Amino acid sequence: MLDEWFSETFPELSRARNLESVFDSWDMPSEDRRAIEIVKKYAEMYQDCPGIRAGLWLYAGDWETAHLICQSDESATGSWWHAILHRFEGDAFNSKYWYRRAVDHPVRDLITFDPQELVEYSQGKNEGRLYLQKEEFFTLLRWCVENRK
């Protein structure tokens, strides 16, 4: 399972911040000071991997830092993270724009849904959305780690 992969890959971070505390919300994950301090260490380890850094900052709840990273990363990976950030923010128009820029990303073949549809699905509060958010986040982050992106 993807959350087991996360716990094995980022053990200190997964102990600091329970997965459910990030994905049980309909909105942007709240900022977690302890997780932010841990992500600072990982950010140094992955300084050449903006996709990993953006995902970890999002996990820690630091939207601003994750957004700055995405804005400076013009790759499809940066665009995908950018789309996720704007979806969490409730900005459907921007989210769809960034998903269109990531249309050829390899992660599209690894998830079970169309991320553009998730933007529409995100407008309502339902458990299915939470599951898909979690699947998308961990699939993209795992791809970034495996490909050093």
Question: Where do the protein language model's features map onto the residues?
Answer:
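Short coil/turn linking the two alpha-helices of tandem helical-hairpin repeats
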Residues: 88-90
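Conserved, surface-exposed functional patches that form binding/active-site neighborhoods
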Residues: 92, 96-100
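Alpha-helical protein-protein interaction scaffolds
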Residues: 82-86, 98
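N-terminal alpha-helical interaction modules that lie
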Residues: 1-72, 101, 105-149
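Structural register within alpha-helical repeat arrays
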Residues: 53-54, 82, 94
